[in-house]
């Protein structure tokens, strides 16, 4: 025991005279230096390392807090003064390096690792640094630990849960994809005999479930309670997901090749359009509309179950080409014979139609700007180099494992990264990116021009009918005559007018996007907020502990009672999500979590703590180890609201309305209309390059 002017008592710090940890929490480097230098000058023989490595009431040292609070300069100073990066706290046996991984500052993780931090150490639950980073959705830290730290991607905790189990349980889809593509075992079983798919099913995380099924996870695997993932979904009232898992391997098109799949949808689209044409042509308007609505409902019920999600589908492109072909055949069959003398106009019209076909088919099969995935190993080296030299960290594609260039986006439908991603267009069954965006705009212009020509000649054709009543003599008589005489022509014109109204809006967005240098994806995606941490790990002052203990204990009781989830068996205990703190044997309260809102700086209510499950060896019952007061549980909560998935394919409502930009920040790519247009036309190669790394300011 060291007792130097009451600075240290045992292994804890006397808060009346010692201010190092509080100074570190507040990021006051000068106070830290001044305090330690004062002690050095007053007591040259005193071991400063022992002071620095002394902990608070929970055993957290100054380096713990500096790593978690992301005070990079303080971390460097403490390590230079002899701070131990592998000293475990008394509460959870977690090291400063593990707190650095939780904090998420990759440069701090790098620095602590290079100064002796051990990424393989485990806390009292068996969580190593990789599992901690996974729980907090720190994909860059996970990538660094795998590429540089040498951590095994399948390293388990004491309950045999791997990082993939935790990513599936937490709903971190992008991180899950990254781990699988880095070689994680999708069928690894924990002590309950559960795979990652079981835990994704337990929480009802739809995107991880679909991703794991696509990767080939065993959907019928039984756990120690004889429950499959679909059984667990059913017990948690996730009935849709239970049906999805149960029928995944029995999908009618999942085992056939893409050729038969595409042929089916092409034939179906042609027959469906002919059927709708037959309805409107042979029935009067009201019965036709009723039959049309009923047919659409049947199609929806039929199409959705047999459509492969996130897979290219030629249904809409075939529909578009068929519609245009009908218009072209009508023009050649009726318009050209009716107006044989305007040869130049017919020539221009045929050129427009043929150009449209050329552009459409080229868009169907063209490369929108795929970012090559053949540089994965080099990208990994570039990533490590950026971290080691403290440059800007490149963003990784969790599927392609490449450093994504700026404005690039991975399309889940096309399964590739697209440079300067604009959107995935279901009507061309392809992405719109840097290579084909101009061609896409030309296609819209050609369709608009063909529509104007078609409508003009349609009305001219009706006007030369000698039996037609004059419009001035009666509007109703005029419309009745032409609807009965030219029923197909009028219905098709109305149909094309609806399409043209939407395409005009789309063309407007595309042109203004070029002028303002903004893509449709950037217009439609939600604004990115500041990155939030799910908990602060900050113990409150000792004076506040007694006041807050009763409140947090009451919150814990109510939360536990309202958040119990059961898998529906006697061997599966309830999973209790506990809030706040518990009391230890001495009657003193444990370190409470001081939650902060990163957006406005105001304190918020603590988040629900996730469960760490252990098995009772004597009876095999699943138990929440946080329920027992004497175990001094960690007050850790994880980020449960994953914001990983940005849509790559717009829904029908967004396609029609195309909302205005929701991000109020200035567009960083807008250089003025003239420069934007020049860049769009000529400077396309820049979007294939990874962001030019710059020095990071700390």
Curated annotation (Swiss-Prot):
Residues 543-584, 631-640 have a biased composition (Low complexity). Glycans are attached at residues 517, 549-550, 554-555, 564-565, 584, 635. ANK repeats lie at residues 58-87, 92-121, 125-155, 159-188, 192-221. It comes from the Eukaryota. Pfam families: Ank, Ank_2, DHHC. Residues 532-605, 619-653 are annotated as: Disordered. It catalyses: L-cysteinyl-[protein] + hexadecanoyl-CoA = S-hexadecanoyl-L-cysteinyl-[protein] + CoA. Its EC number is 2.3.1.225. One of its GO terms (molecular function) is protein-cysteine S-palmitoyltransferase activity. The chain crosses the membrane at residues 263-283, 286-306, 312-332, 334-354, 439-459, 489-509. GO terms for cellular component: membrane. Its main location: membrane. The keyword Acyltransferase applies. Keywords: Acyltransferase, ANK repeat, Glycoprotein, Lipoprotein, Membrane, Palmitate, Repeat, Transferase, Transmembrane, Transmembrane helix. It is found in: Membrane. It is a multi-pass membrane protein. Belongs to the DHHC palmitoyltransferase family. This is Putative ZDHHC-type palmitoyltransferase 6.
């Amino acid at each position: 025991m060291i007792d130097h002017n009451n600075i240290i008592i045992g292994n804890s710090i006397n808060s009346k005279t010692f201010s190092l940890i509080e100074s570190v929490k507040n990021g006051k480097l000068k106070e830290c230096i001044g305090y330690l230098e004062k002690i050095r000058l007053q007591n040259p023989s005193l071991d400063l390392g022992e002071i620095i490595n002394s902990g608070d009431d929970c055993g957290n040292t100054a380096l713990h807090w500096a790593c978690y609070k992301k005070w990079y300069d303080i971390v460097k100073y403490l390590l230079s003064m002899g701070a131990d990066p592998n000293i475990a706290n008394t509460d959870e046996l977690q090291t400063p390096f593990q707190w650095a991984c939780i904090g998420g500052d990759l440069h701090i993780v790098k620095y602590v690792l290079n100064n002796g931090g051990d990424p393989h150490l485990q806390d009292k639950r068996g969580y190593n640094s990789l599992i901690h980073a996974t729980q907090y959705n720190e994909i860059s830290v996970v990538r660094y630990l795998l590429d540089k730290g040498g951590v095994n991607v399948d390293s388990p905790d004491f309950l045999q849960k791997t990082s993939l189990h935790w990513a599936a349980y937490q709903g971190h889809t992008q991180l899950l994809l990254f781990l699988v593509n880095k070689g994680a075992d999708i069928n690894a079983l924990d002590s309950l005999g559960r795979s990652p798919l079981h835990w994704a099913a337990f929480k009802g995380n739809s995107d991880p479930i679909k991703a794991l099924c696509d990767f080939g996870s065993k959907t019928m695997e039984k756990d120690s309670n004889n429950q499959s993932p679909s059984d667990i979904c059913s017990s948690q009232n996730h009935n849709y997901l239970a049906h999805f898992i149960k029928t995944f391997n029995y999908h009618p098109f999942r085992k056939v090749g893409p050729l038969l799949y595409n042929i089916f949808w092409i034939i179906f689209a042609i027959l469906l359009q002919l059927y709708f044409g037959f309805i409107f042509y042979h029935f009067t308007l009201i019965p036709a509309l009723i039959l049309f609505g009923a047919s659409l409902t049947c199609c929806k019920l039929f199409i959705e179950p047999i459509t492969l999600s996130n897979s290219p589908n030629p249904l809409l492109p075939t529909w578009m080409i068929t519609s245009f072909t009908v218009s072209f055949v009508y023009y050649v069959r009726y318009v050209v014979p009716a107006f044989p003398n305007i040869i130049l106009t017919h020539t221009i019209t045929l050129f427009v139609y043929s150009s449209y076909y050329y552009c459409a088919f080229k868009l169907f099969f063209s490369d929108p700007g795929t970012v090559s995935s053949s540089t994965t190993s080099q990208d990994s080296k570039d990533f490590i180099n950026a971290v080691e030299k403290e440059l800007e960290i490149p963003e990784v594609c969790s599927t392609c494992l490449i450093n994504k260039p700026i404005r690039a986006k991975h399309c889940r439908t096309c399964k590739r990264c697209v440079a300067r991603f604009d959107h995935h267009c279901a009507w061309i069954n392809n992405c719109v990116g840097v290579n084909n965006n101009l061609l896409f705009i030309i296609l819209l212009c050609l369709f608009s021009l063909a529509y104007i020509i078609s409508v003009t000649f349609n009305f001219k054709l009706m006007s030369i009918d000698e039996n037609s009543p004059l419009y001035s003599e009666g509007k109703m008589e005029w419309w009745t005559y032409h609807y009965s005489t030219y029923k197909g022509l009028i219905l098709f014109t109305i149909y094309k007018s609806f399409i043209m109204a939407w395409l005009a809006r789309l063309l407007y967005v595309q042109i203004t996007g070029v002028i303002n240098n903004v893509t449709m994806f950037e217009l439609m995606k939600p604004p990115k907020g500041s990155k939030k941490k799910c908990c602060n790990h900050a113990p409150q002052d000792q004076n506040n502990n007694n006041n807050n203990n009763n409140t947090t204990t009451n919150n814990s009781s109510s939360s536990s009672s309202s958040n119990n989830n059961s898998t529906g068996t006697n061997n599966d205990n309830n999973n209790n999500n506990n809030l706040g703190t518990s009391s230890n044997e001495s009657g003193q309260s444990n370190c409470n979590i001081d939650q902060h809102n990163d957006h406005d700086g105001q304190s918020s209510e603590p988040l629900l703590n996730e469960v760490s499950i252990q098995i009772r060896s004597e009876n095999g019952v699943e138990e929440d180890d946080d329920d027992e007061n004497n175990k001094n549980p960690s007050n850790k909560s994880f980020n449960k609201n994953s914001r990983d998935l940005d849509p790559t394919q717009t829904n029908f409502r967004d396609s029609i309305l195309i909302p205005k930009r929701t991000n109020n920040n200035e567009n960083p790519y807008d250089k003025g209309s003239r420069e934007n247009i020049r860049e769009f036309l000529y400077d396309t190669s820049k979007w294939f390059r990874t962001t030019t790394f710059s020095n990071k300011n700390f």
